[in-house]
Amino acid sequence: MTGRMPMRARPPTRPAGAASMRRTRPVKRASAGLTPVRAGAVLAMLLSAFAIYGVGASPAFDFGELRIEGATYTDPDAVQRSVEPARGENLFLLSTAPLLAELRAIPTVADARIGIALPGTLVVTLDEREPVLVWKVGSQRYLVDRDGLLLERLGDNAPPEAEQLPAVVDERARSASFGVGVRLDPVDVDAATRLASLTPAQISSSAGRLAVVATDDHGFELRAQPKGWTAIFGFYTPSLRRTDIIPGQVRLLARLLEGREDEIASIVLADEHDGTYIPKPSPRSSAKPE
Protein backbone atom coordinates (compact mmCIF):
# COMPACT_ATOMS: atom_id res chain seq x y z
CA MET A 1 0.00 0.00 0.00
CA THR A 2 1.37 3.32 -1.03
CA GLY A 3 0.77 6.80 0.40
CA ARG A 4 -1.02 8.15 -2.74
CA MET A 5 -4.56 9.46 -2.57
CA PRO A 6 -6.94 7.94 -5.08
CA MET A 7 -7.94 10.36 -7.95
CA ARG A 8 -11.60 11.16 -8.48
CA ALA A 9 -12.99 10.97 -11.96
CA ARG A 10 -14.12 14.39 -13.37
CA PRO A 11 -17.55 14.70 -14.91
CA PRO A 12 -17.44 14.96 -18.69
CA THR A 13 -17.35 18.56 -19.94
CA ARG A 14 -19.85 19.91 -22.49
CA PRO A 15 -18.57 21.02 -25.81
CA ALA A 16 -18.15 24.82 -25.96
CA GLY A 17 -21.14 26.63 -27.34
CA ALA A 18 -23.52 23.77 -26.84
CA ALA A 19 -26.93 25.05 -25.80
CA SER A 20 -28.68 23.56 -22.90
CA MET A 21 -31.44 21.32 -24.04
CA ARG A 22 -34.82 21.70 -22.38
CA ARG A 23 -37.78 19.61 -22.94
CA THR A 24 -40.91 21.63 -23.65
CA ARG A 25 -44.43 20.45 -23.73
CA PRO A 26 -46.20 20.94 -27.08
CA VAL A 27 -48.76 23.79 -27.07
CA LYS A 28 -52.00 23.23 -28.78
CA ARG A 29 -53.12 26.36 -30.70
CA ALA A 30 -56.67 27.27 -31.51
CA SER A 31 -57.71 26.54 -35.05
CA ALA A 32 -57.79 29.57 -37.42
CA GLY A 33 -61.25 28.73 -38.54
CA LEU A 34 -63.83 31.21 -39.85
CA THR A 35 -65.38 32.87 -36.83
CA PRO A 36 -68.61 34.90 -37.08
CA VAL A 37 -66.65 38.17 -36.75
CA ARG A 38 -64.30 37.24 -39.55
CA ALA A 39 -67.15 36.07 -41.69
CA GLY A 40 -68.90 39.40 -41.23
CA ALA A 41 -65.76 41.33 -42.18
CA VAL A 42 -65.29 39.27 -45.33
CA LEU A 43 -68.92 39.80 -46.25
CA ALA A 44 -68.60 43.57 -45.77
CA MET A 45 -65.52 43.66 -48.01
CA LEU A 46 -67.31 41.71 -50.70
CA LEU A 47 -70.34 43.98 -50.54
CA SER A 48 -68.10 47.07 -50.78
CA ALA A 49 -66.32 45.63 -53.78
CA PHE A 50 -69.61 44.85 -55.50
CA ALA A 51 -70.91 48.35 -54.68
CA ILE A 52 -67.82 50.02 -56.15
CA TYR A 53 -68.09 47.88 -59.23
CA GLY A 54 -71.79 48.69 -59.53
CA VAL A 55 -71.21 52.45 -59.22
CA GLY A 56 -68.40 52.33 -61.75
CA ALA A 57 -70.38 50.26 -64.21
CA SER A 58 -73.77 51.96 -63.87
CA PRO A 59 -74.65 54.47 -66.63
CA ALA A 60 -76.77 56.35 -64.07
CA PHE A 61 -73.58 58.06 -62.82
CA ASP A 62 -72.24 59.07 -66.23
CA PHE A 63 -71.55 62.78 -66.81
CA GLY A 64 -74.61 64.11 -68.58
CA GLU A 65 -75.37 67.54 -67.09
CA LEU A 66 -73.16 70.54 -66.36
CA ARG A 67 -73.75 73.14 -63.66
CA ILE A 68 -71.57 76.27 -63.58
CA GLU A 69 -71.24 78.38 -60.44
CA GLY A 70 -69.40 81.68 -59.94
CA ALA A 71 -69.40 82.72 -63.61
CA THR A 72 -70.05 86.46 -63.90
CA TYR A 73 -67.72 87.33 -66.76
CA THR A 74 -66.71 83.89 -68.03
CA ASP A 75 -68.35 82.65 -71.22
CA PRO A 76 -70.35 79.50 -70.36
CA ASP A 77 -69.47 78.10 -73.78
CA ALA A 78 -65.77 78.25 -72.86
CA VAL A 79 -66.47 76.22 -69.72
CA GLN A 80 -68.53 73.76 -71.75
CA ARG A 81 -65.68 73.24 -74.22
CA SER A 82 -63.21 72.67 -71.40
CA VAL A 83 -65.13 69.77 -69.87
CA GLU A 84 -66.68 68.34 -73.04
CA PRO A 85 -64.03 65.57 -73.41
CA ALA A 86 -65.37 64.02 -70.19
CA ARG A 87 -68.95 63.88 -71.42
CA GLY A 88 -70.40 60.39 -70.83
CA GLU A 89 -67.67 59.26 -68.44
CA ASN A 90 -68.51 57.87 -65.02
CA LEU A 91 -68.26 60.67 -62.46
CA PHE A 92 -66.77 58.40 -59.77
CA LEU A 93 -63.98 57.28 -62.09
CA LEU A 94 -63.38 60.68 -63.68
CA SER A 95 -59.87 62.17 -63.63
CA THR A 96 -60.38 65.87 -62.90
CA ALA A 97 -56.78 67.09 -63.31
CA PRO A 98 -56.93 67.54 -67.12
CA LEU A 99 -60.30 69.29 -66.85
CA LEU A 100 -59.05 71.68 -64.17
CA ALA A 101 -56.03 72.53 -66.32
CA GLU A 102 -58.34 73.45 -69.20
CA LEU A 103 -60.60 75.53 -66.97
CA ARG A 104 -57.69 77.45 -65.43
CA ALA A 105 -56.44 78.28 -68.93
CA ILE A 106 -59.56 80.39 -69.56
CA PRO A 107 -58.36 84.03 -69.21
CA THR A 108 -61.19 85.09 -66.88
CA VAL A 109 -60.58 82.17 -64.50
CA ALA A 110 -58.14 82.48 -61.60
CA ASP A 111 -59.00 79.07 -60.15
CA ALA A 112 -61.61 76.34 -60.53
CA ARG A 113 -63.01 73.42 -58.57
CA ILE A 114 -64.94 70.37 -59.76
CA GLY A 115 -67.58 68.47 -57.82
CA ILE A 116 -70.45 66.13 -58.56
CA ALA A 117 -74.16 66.22 -57.90
CA LEU A 118 -75.83 62.84 -58.18
CA PRO A 119 -76.81 61.15 -60.24
CA GLY A 120 -74.98 62.55 -63.30
CA THR A 121 -74.21 66.27 -62.91
CA LEU A 122 -70.72 67.77 -63.02
CA VAL A 123 -70.47 70.97 -60.93
CA VAL A 124 -67.83 73.54 -61.96
CA THR A 125 -67.17 76.36 -59.48
CA LEU A 126 -65.10 79.30 -60.76
CA ASP A 127 -63.01 81.90 -58.97
CA GLU A 128 -62.78 84.68 -61.54
CA ARG A 129 -60.15 87.32 -62.08
CA GLU A 130 -61.38 90.78 -61.12
CA PRO A 131 -61.69 93.23 -64.05
CA VAL A 132 -60.92 96.89 -63.36
CA LEU A 133 -61.42 98.45 -66.81
CA VAL A 134 -63.22 98.09 -70.10
CA TRP A 135 -60.71 98.58 -72.94
CA LYS A 136 -62.31 99.73 -76.18
CA VAL A 137 -60.58 99.11 -79.51
CA GLY A 138 -62.75 100.15 -82.42
CA SER A 139 -66.04 98.30 -82.03
CA GLN A 140 -64.53 95.72 -79.67
CA ARG A 141 -64.67 95.95 -75.89
CA TYR A 142 -62.46 93.91 -73.58
CA LEU A 143 -62.37 93.34 -69.85
CA VAL A 144 -58.97 94.12 -68.32
CA ASP A 145 -57.70 93.09 -64.88
CA ARG A 146 -55.23 95.05 -62.78
CA ASP A 147 -52.33 93.10 -64.31
CA GLY A 148 -53.30 94.31 -67.78
CA LEU A 149 -54.61 90.97 -69.05
CA LEU A 150 -57.42 91.18 -71.62
CA LEU A 151 -59.81 88.70 -70.05
CA GLU A 152 -62.85 88.58 -72.26
CA ARG A 153 -64.46 90.29 -75.21
CA LEU A 154 -67.80 91.80 -74.28
CA GLY A 155 -70.73 91.16 -76.55
CA ASP A 156 -74.09 92.85 -76.84
CA ASN A 157 -75.38 91.09 -73.73
CA ALA A 158 -72.61 92.12 -71.37
CA PRO A 159 -73.27 91.55 -67.65
CA PRO A 160 -74.45 94.62 -65.70
CA GLU A 161 -71.27 94.51 -63.62
CA ALA A 162 -69.20 95.17 -66.75
CA GLU A 163 -71.26 98.22 -67.67
CA GLN A 164 -70.34 99.81 -64.33
CA LEU A 165 -66.59 99.62 -64.96
CA PRO A 166 -64.63 102.68 -66.12
CA ALA A 167 -63.72 102.60 -69.80
CA VAL A 168 -60.70 103.57 -71.90
CA VAL A 169 -60.75 104.15 -75.65
CA ASP A 170 -57.55 103.02 -77.37
CA GLU A 171 -57.02 104.79 -80.71
CA ARG A 172 -53.38 103.75 -81.12
CA ALA A 173 -52.48 101.87 -84.28
CA ARG A 174 -50.95 98.93 -82.43
CA SER A 175 -54.17 98.26 -80.53
CA ALA A 176 -55.73 96.83 -83.71
CA SER A 177 -53.87 93.57 -83.01
CA PHE A 178 -55.19 93.23 -79.45
CA GLY A 179 -57.29 90.24 -78.46
CA VAL A 180 -58.22 88.06 -75.50
CA GLY A 181 -55.10 86.89 -73.67
CA VAL A 182 -52.97 89.90 -74.64
CA ARG A 183 -51.28 91.67 -71.72
CA LEU A 184 -51.12 95.46 -71.80
CA ASP A 185 -48.14 97.54 -70.73
CA PRO A 186 -48.28 97.95 -66.91
CA VAL A 187 -47.57 101.68 -67.20
CA ASP A 188 -50.50 102.12 -69.59
CA VAL A 189 -52.78 100.19 -67.25
CA ASP A 190 -51.70 102.30 -64.28
CA ALA A 191 -52.24 105.59 -66.14
CA ALA A 192 -55.56 104.46 -67.58
CA THR A 193 -56.84 103.27 -64.19
CA ARG A 194 -55.93 106.57 -62.51
CA LEU A 195 -57.50 108.73 -65.21
CA ALA A 196 -60.60 106.58 -65.74
CA SER A 197 -61.46 106.87 -62.05
CA LEU A 198 -61.91 110.65 -62.30
CA THR A 199 -65.34 112.27 -62.21
CA PRO A 200 -66.28 115.76 -63.44
CA ALA A 201 -66.87 116.89 -59.85
CA GLN A 202 -63.26 116.07 -58.91
CA ILE A 203 -61.95 118.66 -61.36
CA SER A 204 -64.77 121.21 -60.85
CA SER A 205 -66.15 120.52 -64.32
CA SER A 206 -69.73 120.82 -65.54
CA ALA A 207 -69.17 118.19 -68.23
CA GLY A 208 -71.65 115.34 -68.49
CA ARG A 209 -68.88 112.76 -68.38
CA LEU A 210 -65.17 112.29 -69.01
CA ALA A 211 -63.63 109.97 -71.58
CA VAL A 212 -60.08 108.61 -71.36
CA VAL A 213 -58.44 108.15 -74.76
CA ALA A 214 -55.01 106.69 -75.60
CA THR A 215 -53.57 108.23 -78.80
CA ASP A 216 -50.41 107.91 -80.87
CA ASP A 217 -49.91 111.68 -81.09
CA HIS A 218 -50.48 112.89 -77.54
CA GLY A 219 -50.47 109.85 -75.29
CA PHE A 220 -53.32 109.89 -72.79
CA GLU A 221 -56.07 112.45 -73.16
CA LEU A 222 -59.06 113.32 -71.01
CA ARG A 223 -62.02 114.56 -73.05
CA ALA A 224 -65.04 116.35 -71.63
CA GLN A 225 -68.25 115.16 -73.26
CA PRO A 226 -70.39 116.10 -74.99
CA LYS A 227 -68.31 118.50 -77.12
CA GLY A 228 -66.00 119.97 -74.55
CA TRP A 229 -62.35 120.57 -73.90
CA THR A 230 -59.48 118.06 -74.21
CA ALA A 231 -56.77 117.77 -71.55
CA ILE A 232 -53.51 116.24 -72.80
CA PHE A 233 -51.78 114.30 -70.03
CA GLY A 234 -49.14 112.85 -72.35
CA PHE A 235 -47.00 109.71 -72.40
CA TYR A 236 -45.73 107.89 -69.33
CA THR A 237 -42.70 105.66 -68.78
CA PRO A 238 -41.43 103.55 -65.88
CA SER A 239 -38.66 106.04 -65.01
CA LEU A 240 -38.47 109.28 -67.00
CA ARG A 241 -42.12 110.36 -66.76
CA ARG A 242 -43.80 108.28 -64.12
CA THR A 243 -47.53 107.93 -63.52
CA ASP A 244 -47.18 109.29 -59.99
CA ILE A 245 -47.33 112.82 -61.45
CA ILE A 246 -50.97 112.26 -62.45
CA PRO A 247 -52.50 113.45 -59.13
CA GLY A 248 -50.58 116.73 -59.49
CA GLN A 249 -51.68 117.05 -63.12
CA VAL A 250 -55.30 116.58 -62.04
CA ARG A 251 -55.02 119.37 -59.45
CA LEU A 252 -53.46 121.65 -62.06
CA LEU A 253 -56.27 120.83 -64.50
CA ALA A 254 -58.89 121.80 -61.92
CA ARG A 255 -57.20 125.18 -61.38
CA LEU A 256 -56.99 125.89 -65.11
CA LEU A 257 -60.65 125.02 -65.66
CA GLU A 258 -61.92 127.13 -62.81
CA GLY A 259 -63.94 130.06 -64.12
CA ARG A 260 -63.05 129.49 -67.78
CA GLU A 261 -64.15 125.96 -68.69
CA ASP A 262 -66.53 127.12 -71.43
CA GLU A 263 -63.74 129.12 -73.08
CA ILE A 264 -61.12 126.36 -73.27
CA ALA A 265 -60.52 124.16 -76.30
CA SER A 266 -57.53 122.17 -75.03
CA ILE A 267 -55.09 122.01 -72.14
CA VAL A 268 -51.53 120.65 -72.17
CA LEU A 269 -50.35 119.36 -68.78
CA ALA A 270 -46.58 119.06 -69.03
CA ASP A 271 -46.25 118.04 -65.37
CA GLU A 272 -47.75 118.85 -61.97
CA HIS A 273 -46.76 122.52 -62.18
CA ASP A 274 -46.59 123.46 -65.85
CA GLY A 275 -49.78 123.65 -67.90
CA THR A 276 -51.10 125.80 -70.72
CA TYR A 277 -54.47 126.06 -72.38
CA ILE A 278 -55.71 127.08 -75.80
CA PRO A 279 -58.97 129.03 -75.85
CA LYS A 280 -61.78 128.28 -78.24
CA PRO A 281 -61.79 130.46 -81.34
CA SER A 282 -64.08 133.43 -80.92
CA PRO A 283 -67.02 133.42 -83.35
CA ARG A 284 -66.61 135.77 -86.27
CA SER A 285 -69.13 138.51 -86.53
CA SER A 286 -71.37 138.09 -89.53
CA ALA A 287 -71.09 140.64 -92.30
CA LYS A 288 -73.68 143.32 -92.14
CA PRO A 289 -75.70 143.90 -95.30
CA GLU A 290 -75.06 147.20 -96.94
Residue ranges and their predicted role:
Residues T108-D111:
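Glycine-centered tight turns that cap/initiate beta-strands
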Residues M1-G54, F61, R81, R113, ...:
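Charged, solvent-exposed interaction patches on well-folded alpha/beta domains
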Residues S58, A86, A101-R104, P160, ...:
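Structural motif
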Residues F63-E65, A71-A105:
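Short extracytoplasmic
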